[in-house]
Amino acid sequence: MRQFDFMGKRRLAFTTSAVMLLIALVSLAVQQLSLGLDFTGGTLVEVSYHTAPSLDTVRQTLEAAGFQDISVQTFGTADEILIRLQQAFDPNVGQQVTDLLRAGGDQVTLVRAEFVGAQVGEQLRDQSGLGMLVALGVVMLYVAFRFQYKFAVGAIVALIHDVIIVLGAFSLFQIEFDLTVLAAVLAVIGYSLNDTIIVYDRIRENIRLSRIDDMPAIFNDAINQTLSRTLATSGTTILVLLALLVLGGDMIHNFAIALLIGVGVGTFSSIYVASALLLPLKLQRTDLIPAPKENEDAEELP
């Protein structure tokens, strides 16, 4: 199998990561995220059609009636429509929306009308941020316990790198960020960590077994040995996500986009961030070999 010099390209990879992070951070600071109803609060109306309608027609009908900041998507089947309105709750809004849609001659049934308060949205936003921080903290403790603290630093930097780039992409293109996307971001953390752990495990074993101290060469061998597994896993995952993106409907469209970005970036970071960072952190063979106990030499003496 061909051997790729991954570590030889690490400076180019670091530059690429730095550029992506800079763009993501600038976008998050300037444009911020386009938060969905789950975080901002608003009204949710679900209606059922006798035959599948055109989403653009539904949106245009409501906009013509004076509704603003409308999100229209299918919910489950093509004839079930979910309408999100960024407005204060009106107990009659469900019936108003239904009457407007019926005016076009369609058979429309109101399924439900719910309101998500702004305070609830703020709580969800705070809890989701706290949950992400807790997840990263647990990951750092796990990697430090299973490997060594330098591995933990590399893993955490890689995960933060992945999360920022996914969030930055959603900010840059103003794709709605809701609870399903948050779930995808947490899934990206798990996926990226899994890739990183596999590469780390091979690096650790190669360091222990190798008779040379050329760390870049040892890292290259480890990454090349796990490359086929990494590409196979990422490739099959991307195929499934593409199917979800095309066939899954609007409800999981943004979820699939977040995972597609995350899987691609996570595969990159497991090699060029998590692993390559071990070189400037000066990982050495002695870091992975337990120090001898003081009384071991005395016990071996006759």
Label each PLM-derived region with a short phrase.
Residues 1-302:
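A structural signal for conserved, well-ordered secondary-structure elements
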